From Swiss-Prot:
Pfam families: Lys. It is an enzyme of class 3 (hydrolase). The keyword Methyltransferase does not apply. It comes from the Eukaryota. GO terms for cellular component: extracellular region. Lysozymes have primarily a bacteriolytic function; those in tissues and body fluids are associated with the monocyte-macrophage system and enhance the activity of immunoagents. Residues 19-148 form the C-type lysozyme domain. Its main location: secreted. One of its GO terms (biological process) is killing of cells of another organism. This is Lysozyme C. Lysozyme C is capable of both hydrolysis and transglycosylation; it also shows a slight esterase activity. It acts rapidly on both peptide-substituted and unsubstituted peptidoglycan, and slowly on chitin oligosaccharides.
Length: 148
């Protein structure tokens, strides 16, 4: 009985960690989910974006004190405009999704919301990390050797 209690406590103390994708694994997943060429954005640009926004980490979050919003998940999708975290003042929730859904290891919801973001007039330029690290650069290295 004592061993079962200890085992239960050990299992409760295990923290759930987000998935950190390997570069080519992410490229294959994004391609499978329809991002390659979506709204004219190459797969290499999406992988570059994810690298610089989250380090390929599905559980990445970043609080923005200026507007009290938070960026979520592999694409760092913002709670001010795109998802609902129940805390951001004046949030729009244009993706009609809970921000916590953007932190899942299965990135289908994050991809669906990213498709919504890139469909706006600003397109992929909505992401600062893409503008700073991927725009007007050779991003082919992000899919090199991935067979995609």
């Amino acid at each position: 009985m004592k061993a079962l209690i200890i085992l239960g406590l050990v299992l409760l103390s295990v923290t759930v960690q987000g998935k950190i994708f390997e570069r080519c694994e992410l490229a294959r997943t994004l391609k499978k989910l329809g991002l390659d060429g979506y709204k004219g954005v190459s797969l290499a640009n999406w992988v570059c974006l994810a690298k610089w926004e989250s380090g390929y980490n599905t559980e990445a979050t970043n609080y923005n004190p200026g507007d009290e919003s938070t960026d979520y998940g592999i694409f760092q999708i913002n709670s001010r405009y795109w998802c609902n975290n129940g805390k951001t003042p004046g949030a729009v929730d244009a993706c009609h999704i809970s921000c916590s859904a953007l932190l899942q290891n299965n990135i289908a919801d994050a991809v669906a919301c990213a498709k919504r973001v890139v469909s706006d007039p600003q397109g992929i330029r909505a992401w600062v990390a893409w503008r700073n690290h991927c725009q007007n650069r050779d991003v082919s290295q992000y899919v090199k050797g991935c067979g995609v």
